[in-house]
């Protein structure tokens, strides 16, 4: 019964949060008051709050109480190969994109990431993106994608403020079937921090990614920065 009670309390609080009973930054009632209003013990309430905190819905500060957290976009491992637009739509959010640069250039040192000679041409696309209701109005990702020019020669003529990068790739027979990704927490370079509207030394989650097609060709190399305060990543591992 205790387990069921904890689940009921958690769902009641989640419904209140999702229903707008609390705003970002609001302090929830004291544990004694909240437990009494819900008719449960403080240990049961704390168990429910701990679960809500793990989901990023609330933040508990020792000595100060429990506060409503800013919502975070959950990036699931199962959707890592979906475009960011599709991922936002799965969470019923609206995506807005700004293209910062789109140009053809020499591969240089990036050639190694795409199995190209340094003299080869690649197309570089830099964007920052917003998702409604997340990030407190700031961009939720800054990403730079590099693609071999020979695989997508008209990429620089596309409008990536509205077009889906992965859909355009697939229209040219370049479906990303699997990817190799490395995640780490970093202090982003100054130009990235500025694009994400981060304060100095505010951390970001950096994702370094190489995408492969069904033939094993490297079709994209992406460098993405997500503000740590508005992002969560779910990694599922099977044995």
What are these regions (language model features)?
Residues 1-42:
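Extreme N-terminal segment that seeds HTH/winged-HTH DNA-binding domains in transcriptional regulators
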Residues 15-16, 33-35, 41-42, 69-71, ...:
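A short, structure-level motif marking secondary-structure boundaries and short turns
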Residues 17-18, 53, 170:
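Alpha-helix C-terminal capping/helix-coil junction sites
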Residues 22-25, 54-63, 69-70:
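Beta-hairpin "wing" of winged helix-turn-helix
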Residues 49-50:
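Short, hydrophobic-biased segments on the C-terminal half of alpha helices
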């Amino acid at each position: 019964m205790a387990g069921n009670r904890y689940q009921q309390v958690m769902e009641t609080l989640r419904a209140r949060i999702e229903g707008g009973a609390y705003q970002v930054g609001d302090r929830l009632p004291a544990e004694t008051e909240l437990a009494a209003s819900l008719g449960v013990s403080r240990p049961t309430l704390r168990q429910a709050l701990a679960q809500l905190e793990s989901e990023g819905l609330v933040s508990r500060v020792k000595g100060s109480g429990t506060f409503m957290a800013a919502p975070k976009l959950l990036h699931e491992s199962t959707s890592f190969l979906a475009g960011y637009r599709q991922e936002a739509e799965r969470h019923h959010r609206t995506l807005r994109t700004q293209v910062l640069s789109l140009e053809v250039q020499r591969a240089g040192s990036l050639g190694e990431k795409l199995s190209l000679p340094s003299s080869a041409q690649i197309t570089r696309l830099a964007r920052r993106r917003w998702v409604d209701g997340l990030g407190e109005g700031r961009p939720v990702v800054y990403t730079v994608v590099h693609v071999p020019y020979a695989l997508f020669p008209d990429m620089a003529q596309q409008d990536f403020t509205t077009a889906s990068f992965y859909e355009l790739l697939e229209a040219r027979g370049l479906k990303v079937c699997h990817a190799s990704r490395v995640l780490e927490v970093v202090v982003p370079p100054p130009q990235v921090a500025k694009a994400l509207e981060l304060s100095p030394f505010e951390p970001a989650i950096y994702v370094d990614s190489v995408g492969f097609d069904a033939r094993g060709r490297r079709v994209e190399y992406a460098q993405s920065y997500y503000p740590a305060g508005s992002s969560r990543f779910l990694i599922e591992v099977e044995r």
